[in-house]
């Protein structure tokens, strides 16, 4: 399938980031790809292009740029930036990006989903809880911790996941150094409690960041194993008609 792509700038386009889409006029599902703490890296742009070839209009918003953080690369700055920027600020610009995607002429706004990595996965949980229109949620090792609510992170995923109204897929590894066994257990229970279709994929030898080449945890063999599961889930949630 022939695709097109474009780098977006907030002052010109309304959002910052990268968009890829099939070069045809038909309306199609839309996917928002939310980045990890390292920001919009090259592999996420490749993911957008791969999804476009599968028929999805795909937007990778640069959340840092949309919040006024300058720089072409944010690799290694994630911890610092998450101490400066609170979740409500992140959620505001995620909402801006989702509306930008859903309002595109080539997107069916009733068929939108999210793929999110690490920090993006953690932030996607409150966003999905607040956005019942969302049709699919795929979380690669969301960086959820068992921590108290603070001004930076005022709402916890354990509570919010119970209210999500769309099918969800979570992918974790047993060697994840951020979300330990008890955190993963509580998150599993919370997603299971929301009553929506839910897939949990766990790999005992996988590390946090296994799908990101810029992460110390990168495991390309794991990324290759998981990707077909992700695309199959998206097809069932966003392309196939809902069951009666």
Model-derived features with residue positions:
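Alpha/beta-hydrolase fold active-site loops
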Residues: 29, 111, 167
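Serine-hydrolase catalytic machinery in alpha/beta-hydrolase-like enzymes
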Residues: 5-107, 154, 209-214
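C-terminal catalytic histidine-bearing segment of alpha/beta-hydrolase fold enzymes
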Residues: 192-244
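Conserved alpha/beta-hydrolase "acid-adjacent" motif
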Residues: 177-183
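Short beta-strand/loop motif that positions the catalytic acidic residue
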Residues: 164, 170-172, 176
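Alpha/beta-hydrolase-fold catalytic nucleophile elbow
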Residues: 62, 115-117, 138-141, 171, ...
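A short beta-to-alpha transition loop/helix N-cap that caps and shapes the active-site region
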Residues: 67-71, 144-150, 178
